[in-house]
Structures are given as structure tokens and as C-alpha cells.
């Protein structure tokens, strides 16, 4: 989106992503090292911190990445826009707004809360202009999305679907395109700095409802969807560190997990991608891959 606006965009990752998008400069660097970042970009106007270290390493990796990126922003005089999530709030009651306190007690939630608290302190001290976007679970085509690789390929192949947590609790879902749009809007608007913003997202849907919408888009009428179950979730967590961390955030899928994005929508005039388009875009990725492999 930035390249389409004619901006010079440098994408930094630990291994070259080969995105193949015209206008992007792809460079390799270690985001946890200030020196490494300075070798690939000696100056910048805006830094978008979209780092996503392995889920089970957040406690160790996030402090290093955040410290390095923040120092890099201060060295170059750049503004900083952080891509985050809702983990920092921890278990809660009611619809989440940006005013909710950050009171997470599990490792990954504490890690994300600390990133914001430290950067907010730099902002308030006048050392850095920073803002943070907070999205709910992404609905997109990849292995980390609950509605991605775990659902669509199985529907296409006629296989049963098993999902972690309750499949009948309302949940807010976020499209990554809406994350990108908000991050860009925040960087271009002085009203954004010094506070977090929730990503514009559609009305909540249960996991069962989302699977039904995906199945309808695929033209699949006969399918099975069920929860994994608490016992099996715990057993899987013994052997899989990612599932073990997901289990620690189980509260997100055992009761309503609903987010208000009213502030961002009203302040910046944004709205979420229409839900039917979210589903169409999701399915399109898998249909394309299926056609290539078929």
C-alpha cells in the first residue's frame, strides 16, 4: 500500500522474504540489533514495527526487538508505528476499548504490554513519536490464522475441522488489510501519537459461524466442525510449544471476545473491509494454490 502511494519502502527481515512486490526494497537484518538496522537504513521517516518472532519466544525476543527498533527510530528521527494485538489486556469483562488497563499475567500478554508501556514512556518524554495498532485474531491465509490453514484446506478436501477453544462464543476477527490501512493512516495524522488504536473490524462471529461462511463461499454443504476439547488441548500443549502458549491465552475463546474499533473509525474515517469480501479474499488464496497443485 505504501509503495502504491509512491513511497520508498524498505522491508527488513531476518531472511529475504521475496515478496516480489514492485517498489519494495527487501533487505536482510536482525531487528534485535541496532547496528544491523543501521546498516540497511541510515535514515527513515516512519518505522512500522510488524515483527513477529516465534510465538513461544516472545518473552525473550520482544524486549530485544522493541528496544532496538525504538533506539533506531530515535537515532534516525523517525516516527514509530507498532503493530500489536489485544493480549496485553489479559482476561476482561465487556467489550474491549483502548481505555482498558494492560493487566495480562501470561508471558506473551506481559511481553506485548511491556512493549507499549516502554514506548509510551518515550513518547511522553518527548524522545519519540509512537502509536500502536491493536488487532484481534487475523483471518487470512496462513498457518497461524485460526481460520486459515486449519480450516480452508480441510473444507476443500472434505476433512473434518477441529478448533481450539469454544466454537460458539462471539469473537472479533481482524483482516490484515485493515491493519495496514490503519497503520498508514496513523503515520500521516498527528492525532494518532501517544496512544493505541483498535483496528477497524467487523461485527463478532463465532468460530462455527466463520467456518459456515467459508464453506458457503467454497460451495461446500457437507462438513464437520468440532472443538478439540480441553483434555486434548492440554495433551497437545505438552508436545507443541506454540499450542502450549495458545492454551495460556485460552480465555480468548472460552467467552465473548469482542472489540470496539469505534475510536479509529470515527477519528480517521475508516471502516473494515466488508465481511463477504474478507471471506472471498481468504478463499481465493487457497483456490489459487489448489488450482496450481491440481
Where are these regions (language model features)?
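Conserved catalytic-site region of short-chain dehydrogenase/reductase
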Residues: 56, 86-96, 138-145
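Conserved beta-loop-beta element that borders a ligand/cofactor-binding pocket
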Residues: 85, 118-142
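Substrate-binding strand-loop-helix patch
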Residues: 142, 170-177, 199-217, 226-234, ...
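Terminal hydrophobic/aromatic helix or amphipathic segment near a protein terminus
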Residues: 212-258, 291-292
Amino acid at each position: 500500500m505504501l509503495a502504491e502511494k509512491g513511497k520508498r519502502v524498505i522491508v527488513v527481515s531476518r531472511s529475504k522474504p521475496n515478496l516480489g512486490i514492485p517498489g519494495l526494497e527487501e533487505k536482510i537484518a536482525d531487528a534485535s540489533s541496532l547496528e544491523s538496522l543501521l546498516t540497511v537504513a541510515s535514515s527513515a521517516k516512519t518505522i512500522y514495527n510488524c515483527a513477529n518472532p516465534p510465538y513461544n519466544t516472545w518473552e525473550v525476543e520482544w524486549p530485544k526487538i522493541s528496544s532496538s527498533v525504538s533506539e533506531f527510530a530515535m537515532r534516525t528521527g523517525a516516527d514509530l508505528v507498532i503493530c500489536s494485538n489485544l493480549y496485553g489486556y489479559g482476561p476482561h469483562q465487556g467489550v474491549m476499548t483502548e481505555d482498558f488497563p494492560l493487566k495480562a499475567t501470561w508471558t506473551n500478554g506481559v511481553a506485548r504490554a511491556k512493549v507499549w508501556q516502554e514506548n509510551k514512556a518515550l513518547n511522553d518524554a518527548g524522545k519519540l513519536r509512537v502509536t500502536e495498532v491493536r488487532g484481534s485474531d487475523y483471518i487470512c491465509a496462513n498457518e497461524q490464522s485460526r481460520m486459515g490453514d486449519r480450516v480452508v484446506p480441510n473444507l476443500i478436501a472434505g476433512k473434518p475441522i477441529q478448533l481450539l477453544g469454544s466454537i460458539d462464543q462471539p469473537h472479533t476477527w481482524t483482516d490484515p488489510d485493515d491493519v495496514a490501512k490503519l497503520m498508514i493512516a496513523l503515520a500521516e495524522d498527528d492525532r494518532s501519537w501517544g496512544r493505541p488504536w483498535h483496528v477497524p473490524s467487523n461485527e463478532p462471529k463465532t468460530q462455527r459461524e466463520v467456518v459456515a461462511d467459508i464453506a458457503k463461499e467454497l460451495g461446500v454443504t457437507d462438513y464437520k466442525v468440532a472443538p478439540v476439547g480441553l483434555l486434548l488441548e492440554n495433551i497437545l500443549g505438552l508436545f507443541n510449544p506454540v499450542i502450549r502458549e495458545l492454551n495460556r491465552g485460552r480465555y480468548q475463546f472460552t467467552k465473548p471476545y469482542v472489540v470496539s474499533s469505534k475510536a479509529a473509525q470515527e477519528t480517521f474515517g475508516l471502516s473494515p473491509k466488508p465481511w463477504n469480501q474478507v471471506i472471498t479474499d481468504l478463499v481465493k488464496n487457497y483456490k489459487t494454490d489448489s488450482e496450481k497443485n491440481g
